[in-house]
Amino acid sequence: MLDSVTHSTFLPNASFCDPLMPWTDLFSNEDYYPAFEHQTACDSYWTSVHPEYWTKRHVWEWLQFCCDQYKLDANCISFCHFNISGLQLCSMTQEEFIEAAGICGEYLYFILQNIRSQGYSFFNDAEETKTGIKDYADSSCLKTSGIKSQDCHSRTSLQSSHLWEFVRDLLLSPEENCGILEWEDREQGIFRVVKSEALAKMWGQRKKNDRMTYEKLSRALRYYYKTGILERVDRRLVYKFGKNAHGWQEEKL
């Protein structure tokens, strides 16, 4: 579907386009400069415009930023699929992003949807943004592959690299918990943060970030609503493990 839409709608000069050409090669290939013939020197940078109003140049600036900021492999991203306007980009489905950019498509789709819903404040905390993006891709890969991850993390060392796993392991480690977290409904996976700043301090020490606050930590936790790792609970400081979280259930005999 994506190919047919791309070649018939997005690219009027598609016959000259190599579909395997990385988009980064565009700037060194004069054949493709006409795509930007209406671009002027005074055009604004992509962060000053809502994604639906991006020009083709804005789309490319955004791709360049994502590759630089999140270490994505630009060679995986096909130029032909992204020689489009912001409105066309926003209409692409997650499956089309994956078809156009492979595993990078997972990340790009997540970033774009967060920009559309949160604005550019999404990038205010690079550490939290990278955590959210990585966990989104991890959970998506888990879902699409159909492979259930094994609970191979140590419950006492709390060395988990993801925030939600850190919280899970802390709940399962009373000797480390010290009353910071407590179960409200163990069977349903519902828990409460009792000592919010203590939790933030412990996570900050884990990540070597002495500026960590609960406000930042809770923002990172909310990213997990999008991935199905956590579910929203309409009570302050209360969270629930979602369908894509694993390792928190009590073992049934």
From Swiss-Prot:
Expression across tissues is: Expressed in lung, kidney, stomach, brain, ovaries, tongue, bladder and mammary glands.
Q: Where in the cell is it found?
A: Nucleus
**Which cysteine pairs are covalently linked by disulfides here?**
none
UniProt key word Flavoprotein: no
* GO BP term, example: ectoderm development
Domain PNT: from-to ranges: 33-119
* Record key words, sorted: Activator, DNA-binding, Nucleus, Transcription, Transcription regulation
Q: What would be an example GO MF term here?
A: DNA-binding transcription activator activity, RNA polymerase II-specific
The record's listing under SMART domains reads: ETS (SM00413), SAM_PNT (SM00251)
Q: Where does the source fall among the domains of life? A: Eukaryota
CC per GO annotation: cytoplasm; nucleus
Which InterPro entries does the record associate with it? Ets_dom, ETS_fam, Pointed_dom, SAM/pointed_sf, WH-like_DNA-bd_sf, WH_DNA-bd_sf
What ranges are recorded for DNA binding? 161-242
What's its job?
Transcriptionally activator that may play a role in regulating the later stages of keratinocytes terminal differentiation. Binds to DNA sequences containing the consensus nucleotide core sequence GGA[AT]. Transcriptionally activates the TK promoter.
What protein family does this chain belong to?
A: Belongs to the ETS family.
Q: What is known of its domains?
A: The PNT domain acts as a transcriptional activator.
Q: What is this protein called?
A: ETS-related transcription factor Elf-5
State the organism named in the record: Mus musculus
* Annotated gene: Elf5
